[in-house]
Amino acid sequence: KPKRAAGPRVSRRTFALGAVGAAVVMGLGGVRYLPSRTLLRPPGGQDEEQLVRGCLHCEKCREVCPKHAIAPAHLEDGILNARTPRMDFKSGWCDFCENEPGGPKCVAACPTHALVCTDPASVIIGKAVLNRDWCLAAKGMGCHECVDVCNYDALELGADNVPVVNVGACNGCGACEWACISLSAGSISAGATDRAIVIRPTEEVEA
């Protein structure tokens, strides 16, 4: 039987920080105190309990992400979520390291297997949601940046030339959110507080 490949080595300082974090978690009664806010996780982090229990906050997953799409969660995301990895589609998107041998680099870099991904093609990070009130295409500007970058046939232009999301085909890669230029349109998108198309947790979209 082949041996399981060893993960990256963890420094004493990182291990100590992780141990302190784990102690806090257990002192608070564990994952039942997870906040209600759901975060978008990297590939292999969709098992929330496994991720929170195993994450050492070492940020190795963030460091190796070739698309710069991973960021540490903040305290306002919840005390147990703080410094765990979340997706940041304002900075990049996830291609699941499709051209990298061995699958997602974030998964390979995780020293505790808090991220586990055996089949990247089956991973659903989230689902795209379009706000027509902020969409440049809906304002007659002819924008279709999000449609152009989608590699999964999850976006198409509707009869009115406004993007339509095929929720079933969307895996939440975030390319559409990263490419959206609505917030840079000045007065055209006045009042907008986010990009016109964003990725939301699956349960929020399909509820």
Task: Label every model-predicted segment.
Residues K1-A207:
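Non-ligating segments of multi-cofactor redox enzymes
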